A protein has these predicted regions:
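C-terminal/domain-terminus segments
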Residues: 251-279
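Acidic/histidine-rich catalytic cores of soluble enzymes
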Residues: 127-228, 234
Length: 284
């Protein structure tokens, strides 16, 4: 059965300021019971707090996160910390592990992206022996075409053991229909990120650039898309959620990459209310 949860990175500042235990408590008070852990330091203390929070608030960890190789000095990765990452997954009780993004140096080279996919596939096979499934989270760059093929499809071809965590906002930003991509990868998608796609109106300040700085106006005009709580934008979210469920998704995870100065917990409450109002309340 599909469950609805939340992506920890949405409230990453809270994890740093009040710790995992109190952050899980606040998420639970909204109504979220499943949390995908990402951008949270996996220190022994934090892992212990997560375990305790899950027990005290009847919550669960939907998935953990890992890089294939370090993207910055000191970052844990499957390359350098395989045993610890496996141990952390088992400690918090999840069998799902996800790669958050394509490393930056792989984004400008098809050859390097293919090397990454093959390396991820080897780790997917190795993790499978530990009872853990590995997934890859997309952004818009996976919809660059190489000889007519999306990079996402090329990654899939070179990493058959790697599942996908499809992000409906980033699929839309990449120029594709999220419903179609969810349908295309049915059976390969057990994690889905839900966030809305909001186009913001121009401001009077933006219009003022018409008289003083045309380049600044064009920059403002071309960059109107923002992340938004569910129901606040233009994505066909009900169709996305229904197709994700039909495609075998285990967790629909609410995420908002930025709250633009607003309280992210209030943003998550807006998304929670939209999901309940649209018939998904029994999935929490």
């Amino acid at each position: 059965m599909t469950k609805i949860g939340v992506q920890a990175s949405t409230v990453v500042d809270a994890f740093k300021e009040i710790g995992p235990y109190e952050t899980f408590k606040k998420l639970n008070e909204i109504g979220y019971k499943s949390v995908e852990v990402s951008q949270v330091e996996t220190s022994e203390e934090n892992i212990d707090q997560i375990i305790r929070a899950c027990k005290d608030f009847d919550m669960e960890v939907a998935a953990m996160s890992a890089a294939v190789e370090p993207m910055f000095p000191g970052q844990e990765s499957l390359d350098t910390d395989f045993d610890k990452i496996v141990a952390d997954c088992k400690a918090v009780g999840t069998d799902l592990l996800r790669i958050g993004m394509l490393p930056f140096d792989k984004m400008a080279s098809l050859e390097k992206a293919i090397e990454f996919a093959k390396k991820a596939n080897k780790f997917a096979i190795k993790l499978k022996e530990e009872g853990i499934k590995l997934y890859y989270h997309n952004h818009h760059v996976e919809f660059v075409r190489y000889d007519g093929k999306y990079l996402l499809d090329i990654i899939a071809e070179n990493a058959p053991e790697l599942g996908f965590e499809l992000d409906v906002h980033w699929v839309q930003r990449g120029g594709e229909n999220p419903v179609n991509i969810l349908k295309k990868y049915a059976g390969k998608v057990e994690l889905v990120h839900l966030k809305d796609y909001e186009v913001m109106p121009l401001t009077m300040e933006d219009l003022g650039f018409l008289q003083t700085d045309m380049e600044a106006f064009r920059l403002a005009f071309d960059n109107r898309v923002r992340f938004a709580p569910l129901g606040q934008g233009s994505l066909p979210l009900k169709e996305c959620a229904d197709q994700a469920i039909a495609s075998g998704c285990r967790y629909l995870l609410v995420e908002q990459d930025s709250s633009y100065g607003r309280d992210p917990f209030k943003e998550l409450k807006i998304s929670y209310d939209w999901l309940v109002e649209n018939g998904y309340g029994d999935l929490f």
